[in-house]
Amino acid sequence: MKKLVFFLVCLFTMQVVVADNDKPVTFEQLPQAAQSFVKKHFADRNVAFSKMDKDIFDVTYDVMFVNGDKLEFDKQGNWKEMKCKHGLVPETAVPAQIVKYVKTNYPEAKILQIEKDRYEYEVRFMGHRTKRFFQWSGKMGERF
């Protein structure tokens, strides 16, 4: 019983220590790929701040714009999520197959958020309560 309590205390302590590892970074301290992506697709928006978030096994970078829009990048600078609260995700930043599918099947829809993980893209639209999932190939798909 003592070992179990000790283990739980250690586990809780580790969670507290790791929980807040956000570190402000300048735009120039972001990975080069992230800097290029922002300059190419979000040049019309002003960066409010950027931060590095260190987890136990991973590092991510967040870029927040003055208008509230947010980008998240992995440690190599590849985008993981684009979330636009007061704007739209630029079509140039979205994979071409997804843009084509959305224009064909939802001509009035505008992309507000897109997130990618290891298996798929998740897309949310303005004016639609639904979200759509796309396989890495860009094909509309069911969730795995």
How should these model regions be labeled?
Residues M1-D22, V38:
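Bacterial Sec-dependent N-terminal signal peptides
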Residues D20-F144:
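Interaction-mediating elements
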